[in-house]
């Protein structure tokens, strides 16, 4: 039975993970079924196969803009946490009020 001092690492104090998931291709998480479901909700009947990649590209650009403006808003307010209201203000500024 070992006694750990203050410098020892107990449970939940692990170091860096060796096998970390690569975050380079997260846009593929927007699946074909998800895009189809959104299109059906919007009233689309048939979907061309090339639409899925284009939709992912457009969605990525849209999110980059929203996140960039939300971070700028947060930095201007001298905060470090992007709040939901910051995102709401950005969408309102773009004319997409929630």
UniProtKB/Swiss-Prot annotation:
Residues 17-21 bind DNA. InterPro entries: Histone-fold, Histone_H4. Keywords: Chromosome, DNA-binding, Nucleosome core, Nucleus. One of its GO terms (molecular function) is DNA binding. Gene3D superfamilies: Histone, subunit A (1.10.20.10). One of its GO terms (biological process) is nucleosome assembly. GO terms for cellular component: nucleosome; nucleus. The keyword Cell cycle does not apply. SUPFAM superfamilies: Histone-fold. It is found in: Nucleus; Chromosome. Core component of nucleosome. Nucleosomes wrap and compact DNA into chromatin, limiting DNA accessibility to the cellular machineries which require DNA as a template. Histones thereby play a central role in transcription regulation, DNA repair, DNA replication and chromosomal stability. DNA accessibility is regulated via a complex set of post-translational modifications of histones, also called histone code, and nucleosome remodeling. The nucleosome is a histone octamer containing two molecules each of H2A, H2B, H3 and H4 assembled in one H3-H4 heterotetramer and two H2A-H2B heterodimers. The octamer wraps approximately 147 bp of DNA. Belongs to the histone H4 family. This is Histone H4-like protein type G. It comes from Homo sapiens (Human). The lineage of its organism: Eukaryota, Metazoa, Chordata, Craniata, Vertebrata.
């Amino acid at each position: 039975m070992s006694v750990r001092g203050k410098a020892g690492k107990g449970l939940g104090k692990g170091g860096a993970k060796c096998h970390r998931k690569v975050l380079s291709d997260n846009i593929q998480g927007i699946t074909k079924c998800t895009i189809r479901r959104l299109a059906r909700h919007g009233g689309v009947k048939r979907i061309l196969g090339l639409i899925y990649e284009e939709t992912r590209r457009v969605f990525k650009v849209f999110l980059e803009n929203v996140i960039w403006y939300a971070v700028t808003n947060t930095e201007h307010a001298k905060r470090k946490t992007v709040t939901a209201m910051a995102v709401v203000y950005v969408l309102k500024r773009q004319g997409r009020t929630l």
